[in-house]
Amino acid sequence: MKSSVWKLAAMVSLAVGVCGGACAQAQQAAKPRWQMPTVTLVHDAGSQELPREKTQLAETKSKPQSLASLAGDSAVTQGIQAGVNDAAWGVAGHMNSAVGGTAVTQGGSILGGMLASRKPTVTYVWGVPGPASGNILKTTSPKFSVNFAGAPGVNPSDFAPEIVRLTLAQNTCRLIGATRGKEDARSHDAADWEIYSGFVEDRVAANVQKTGEGQYDLSPQSPLYPGEYAVVLRPISKNEKFSGGDVSRGQGAGMMFDTVWTFQVAENAQ
């Protein structure tokens, strides 16, 4: 009798163990491997997730002395308003992929390759269309919870969130930041572009507290003046190299420059 009880107990224990392992595997499988970055506004009444926006990228020959100096450049405002056709950039014209390089070499001979390697340097400007954000805050001291731990193709330890002030350009768009790069940088798949080494932006002094891998609490150190702002994700190292192709396509580490959460501090904010 005791032997039968022991056998039954062993069978139950084995079944529980198998079920436990299977349940754990099922839970792991149900959990998404990738998750797009999120920014949540945290306040006394609860929390509100801000909509994630995609930046537009424009080109100009003007040097980026400041965002204010670029705000009057029609090439910048027109480029951001029209938006960049990322698909066209990936397929046409600026051929620097393996296939494109072969086509250029066959059609343009060695001279064409030499000229291609001497592309002039231009200024790339990131911005968002429209003169104002639809996310209007009534507080001058917002608190945000930022999570990009599951961002696809991104090492979260390489990035941290920031708050930047946006610059209104000709009442048509808001400028986020700018940097220098080769004219064909957006078509390069190789990670050879130090985007952030000379990046121009109006960063706000902020309290940045890491709560986990790719997870942060973020708030300004001082009350914000009324105006246009954004939460952005930036490389911790200014020498981090990026693929211009990834930036154009909004994928991998390049996605971090293409992603923004805008907000407006109202005139009557407290």
Positions of predicted regions on the chain:
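Short, solvent-exposed loop/turn positions at domain surfaces
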Residues: G130-A132, V204, L218
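A glycine-anchored, Pro-Gly-centered beta-turn/N-cap motif
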Residues: G214, P220-E228, V232
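Primarily secretory-pathway and cell-envelope proteins
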Residues: Q25-D189, R234-Q270
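Extended, solvent-exposed segments with strong compositional bias
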Residues: K182-E213
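Bacterial N-terminal signal peptides
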Residues: A9-G20
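Generic structural detector for well-ordered beta-strands
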Residues: N207, D217-S219, T262-Q264
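Bacterial N-terminal signal peptides that target proteins for export
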Residues: M1-M11
